[in-house]
A protein has these predicted regions:
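Flexible, glycine-rich terminal cap/loop adjacent to redox cofactors
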Residues: 4-33, 38, 45, 49-56, ...
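Core beta-strand elements of the Rossmann-like FAD/NAD(P) dinucleotide-binding domain
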Residues: 2-4, 127-137, 250-259, 296-297
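N-terminal Rossmann-like dinucleotide/flavin-binding domain of flavoprotein oxidoreductases
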Residues: 2, 41-42, 46-132, 211-237, ...
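Rossmann-like dinucleotide-binding cores of NAD(P)H-dependent redox enzymes
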Residues: 89-92, 166, 172-176, 182-246, ...
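Residue-level detector of alpha-helix initiation sites
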Residues: 8-15, 34-35, 146, 166, ...
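Glycine-rich dinucleotide-binding loop and its adjacent helix/turn
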Residues: 44, 142-197, 229, 276-296
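FAD-site-proximal beta/loop scaffold in flavoenzymes
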Residues: 155-172, 254-334
Length: 460
């Protein structure tokens, strides 16, 4: 039986752990899927490459408002897919080849789970092929998977998730998307911009309900002007007919589609690891970790979607850096360890309009007892907004009027994910609203002036 110093389950952010400090350690890497994990292969990176193609198409369609006549001759879906995965697939293949070539690393390419804890404290792991090995330390970075409602899963109809929709053989004429979160809205934007009719089926009354209410309501209105949104609806069943797929809704109606994308959330893969056999605690279907990313089992760490509620690649990368350092410390030596910092975790939704946010929503700030001040500034209020003829972009800032501290920032509009960065810095380093507004130059007439004006509105 092989014996290792370290076993890593998952090759998303977990694959970034090994640097020169681990060159003398024997390492087992366990990956049943494609090397690189969700973000590289079926998540953040390929979706944003599709989003960019969608934005090019939208720019052409809207060119007339700027005095330029243009039209789209054809959408070459095969070429779009080839452009994306012609870049992505070699990276995944190269990553696996690189690890396999390292003399201190063995790669196990079938599903791996915990088997038992040995008398000496080492962990026994077993693959679905029946191979067994032990490791002194284990890092669980097994990610998450798309969750499919039983009403669709049990009917046997063909459906897509974010794992495979980007490789659909051809563009459907009508795509029904089940779900109203960030994955659903990004794919609605992509396929709509490429000429596909979109219908969204959502259980609640609004899209992107995790956002601040102002942005969620505003985005839902914008989306409803472009896509059909069936709100307050559940799927009871589905079947196929000669025309495609039929979804049966709880109001008695049927919804005909050429293709169905299920985007109703993701579930941690923690339940597939037999973690309890190793004494690893779970809560709300995720592995429980402390601020050092330690699990309840000695010498076992976890990171990323398998243990984090954020489901964001930049969070997983941050946690990987923490684990990378803490693996080299004694298990109880917290003075030598570093802790994760999840105080101000930003996120973005790459739909149209783009959305970015960090910190508290207005409702959350009120619930926490802050003396809340809010300012909403429109893109149309600044010169760059005039240049782009923007009518939808807004910045909403939330502060504590007693201390001047920024509590939350919520942006909807062009390049929201880029222009929010100085606000993330302000919150992280404790700058007040007034210091942020007046302590630096703001380039005129650049788009970040909309942030400057919002800050000034709070500091007056």
């Amino acid at each position: 039986m092989e014996s290792y110093d370290l076993a890593i389950i998952g090759t998303g952010s977990g694959n970034s752990l090994l640097d020169d400090r681990y060159a003398r350690k024997r390492v087992a890497i366990c990956e049943q899927g494609t090397f690189g994990g969700t973000c590289l292969n079926v998540g953040c990176i390929p979706t944003k490459m599709f989003v960019y193609a969608a934005e090019v198409a939208e720019t052409i369609r809207s060119a007339a408002r700027y005095g330029i006549d243009a039209h789209i001759d054809r959408v070459r879906w095969d070429d779009i897919v080839s452009r994306v995965f012609g870049r992505i697939d070699p990276i995944a293949i190269g990553g696996e080849d690189y690890r396999r070539a390292q003399p201190n690393v063995d790669v196990y390419d079938t599903h791996t789970r915990f088997a038992a804890v040995q008398d000496d404290g080492r962990y026994l792991l077993r693959t679905d092929d029946g191979e067994e090995f032990t490791a002194e330390q284990v890092v669980i970075a097994a990610g998450a998977r798309a969750e499919v409602p039983p009403a669709i899963l049990d009917c046997g109809v063909r459906y897509y998730t974010s794992d495979d929709i980007m490789r659909i053989p051809q563009l459907p004429k009508h795509l029904v998307i089940v779900g109203g979160g960030f994955v659903a809205c990004e794919f609605a934007h992509i396929f709509s911009a490429l000429g596909v009719r979109i219908t969204m089926v959502i259980r609640g009354g609004a899209l992107l309900r995790h956002l601040d209410d102002t942005l969620s309501r505003r985005f839902t209105r914008i989306a409803a002007s472009k896509w059909e949104v069936r709100s307050h609806r559940n799927i009871l069943g589905s079947h196929e007919n000669r025309s495609g797929i039929v979804l049966e809704l709880d109001d008695g109606s049927d919804l005909q589609a050429d293709a169905v994308l299920v985007a109703t959330g993701r579930r941690s893969n923690a339940d597939r690891l037999d973690a309890d056999t190793a004494g690893i605690a779970m809560d709300d279907r995720r592995i429980v970790v402390d601020e050092y990313q330690r699990t309840s089992a000695r010498n076992v760490f976890a990171l990323g979607d398998v243990s984090s509620p954020y489901e964001l690649k930049h969070v997983a990368n941050h946690e990987a850096r923490v684990v990378q350092r803490n693996l080299l410390c004694g298990w109880d030596d917290t003075k030598a360890m570093v802790a994760t910092d999840h105080r101000y975790v930003p996120a973005a939704v790459f739909t149209d309009p783009q959305i970015a946010y960090v910190g508290l929503t207005e409702n959350e700030a009120v619930a926490k007892g802050f003396d809340v001040s809010c300012k909403i500034q429109h893109y149309a209020d600044v010169a760059y907004g005039w240049a782009t003829e923007d009518t939808v972009g807004i910045v909403k800032l939330i502060s504590d009027s007693k201390t001047g501290q920024l509590l939350g920032a919520h942006i909807m509009g062009h390049q929201a994910s880029s222009i929010i960065q100085p606000l993330i810095q302000a919150m992280t380093f404790g700058l007040t609203v007034h210091e942020m507004a007046r302590g630096q130059y703001w380039i005129h007439p650049a788009l970040p002036e909309v942030i400057e004006n919002a800050l000034l509105g709070l500091s007056d």
